[in-house]
């Protein structure tokens, strides 16, 4: 007999002892679609990166220069909008559906205002950003254009992220997964026509003329922007048309409430600060890498893309951990919150250990997907093998942080990530890069991720993350 998250939440609210098989079933029901989504999304990103990579190392380096800045801006926004999903999970766990829909409505207002403001900010600084990051003058025009076009799509990217995370909080991991996969497929299709010029291709023995704009790096950015627009619109459409606890067609107020603002500050501000701390450290790391030459920049950027094959599975399980722990806390079941957190964390460590082995063995082949440059492949494979050793503990930190955030302990996650990233990774990278180049930077990364996993496991075991209690 299958059981849904909604049914399990009802059992928790009644104070019943939930069988372990039901717990495992719900964990798998939420985790598997998210993991498969992340795998498909990662595969599409591989294809996307390969399309740019085959233009040349300079094109890859242009995007790599601003990639950490896209992480910074989107990461801060994601930290804020994830606080709405955490509120929804806890309210649904407490069977406060009206409050959950109220949070959804307020998130729509937030996305419209903040998303447009962020887009304007990104476009405004795009002309100067590559220079601030120390990019070679030959890379700055493409890097600037990429960041400006990407920034313009932020309102849609926020919409897709917010509404998809809320659907997961309600126990539906399949729909947002399908939307995300479709978005990535569209990104690849758009890029196929926008990046490359009109050209002759042989398909099944037939010579065909394939139309293309030949916009290169700006074309890649536009493809991503258009795909985000479709994804955000679809996610909103699901919430408008589908019946269920989050159906916004049901009567309710659009008024901004004090409780929502308090929870946004309590949970969202530390999440945004955490993303800012991590991403700004990445910006500084990119600046360190920028001084190591075009080959190192390209190998670093493509290596990050290749590594995502490992850690994206962890982020899929993190989505499930956040929803499950959030609903358990809302139902006032600390015992179930602990059970969910350890089950999900163990799953994350196991899967990322396996993918880490695969990354170590097939590192050259992974790099070869993205570029034909032999020097970039050799250097990228070397640093990927260093990073593979840290994947299990990286998985522990990813999933444990999701569980803690579901309980409202975003401040604890922020502190651990801040200490780890700024105290360990940046310090080591600064010391090692002048002597060991990109290899030194990635050794610093691998060591830091291992220590971060240890810190999160210690906090998870101590249990103080549950003392934050349910939201207002």
Question: Which residues are covered by each model-predicted region?
Answer:
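Short alpha-helical transmembrane segments in multi-pass integral membrane proteins
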Residues: 1-34, 88-155, 186, 202-268, ...
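N-terminal transmembrane alpha-helices
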Residues: 18-50, 54-55, 68-87, 112-119, ...
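Transmembrane helical elements of multi-pass membrane transporters/channels
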Residues: 29-48, 149, 160, 227-231, ...
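Residue-level hotspots within the lipid-embedded alpha helices of multi-pass solute transporters
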Residues: 38-39, 75, 115, 119, ...
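Helix-terminus/linker motif at the lipid-water interface of multi-pass membrane proteins
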Residues: 39-61, 130-137, 193-197, 207, ...
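Alpha-helical transmembrane segments of multipass membrane proteins
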Residues: 46-50, 128, 162-166, 188-193, ...
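Interfacial/gating helices of multi-pass transporter permease domains
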Residues: 51-71, 137-145, 217-222, 259-267, ...
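Small-residue-rich hydrophobic transmembrane alpha-helices
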Residues: 60-120, 157-176, 286, 299-363, ...
